[in-house]
Amino acid sequence: MEIPYVRQPIRLPARYAHGPDSFVQPGVPQGALHEYDWNESRVFPGTRRRYWVYVPVQYRASEPATLMVFQDAEWYMNIDFEVRAPVVFDNLIHKEEMPVTIGVFVEPSENRNAEYDAFDDAYATFLLEEIIPAVRAEYAVTDDSDRWAIAGGSSGGNCAFTAAWFRPDRFRRVFCSSGSFVQMPAGNPYPALIRETPPKPLRIFLHAATRDLNHNSPENNWLSANLQVAAALAERGYDFRLIVGDGEHDGNHGGVLLPDAFRWLWRTEPIGDE
């Protein structure tokens, strides 16, 4: 595939323009978002949050749908923000460039960093034992792990990565934009851990930014941490893709990339195949 020439910016940071799949298109049916409250958690006692379920027009209860879970619900589902996942779902499902998918957008509690930056299976367990069963009680979702994905940006990005790392039996496809790996309490465990551990059955889309937080610092460098994770994935032969942009620690470039990320994550080749 030949990519058209695009003049690169001289002054940074840069902002990126959204493509047509990030805008509401005439003639494309729009899915619905349904809001729910979750006020009694066993995994995170005393916390409260909301979550939303996106249901595409093409959904049929007789045909179990693919599942994709997003952290930081508002950042990902608000079509006036940068990411606009529901609009991208509408356009790509309509064109059959991704499967019919139930999207679950979960708010963090007031303990966002404690939940998202932890290096354990607690958040994955919260999703798998609390939120997702509630969703599946109302909507037909496939039990095929190859059709379950998880996504997030910033701390929500490393949260998504960690959930898939601990539970690859459930989450197989990962979207991680500007992951805050440096905020994990004991430091970023993944570069060493990925190299030391047999490869897991994961397909991972990573986005990093050259002007991310502390990009020119030897410590707590978001860009460096994401590149180190990507390098380890490459060395172990993972089914992964890395896109590096010239933006900052915001949702702009990651949001612009979302349609291409979805197309790549949901391509039909078995996980592990390029």
Residue map of PLM features:
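Non-catalytic cap/lid and distal C-terminal segments of serine-dependent acyl enzymes
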Residues: 1-274
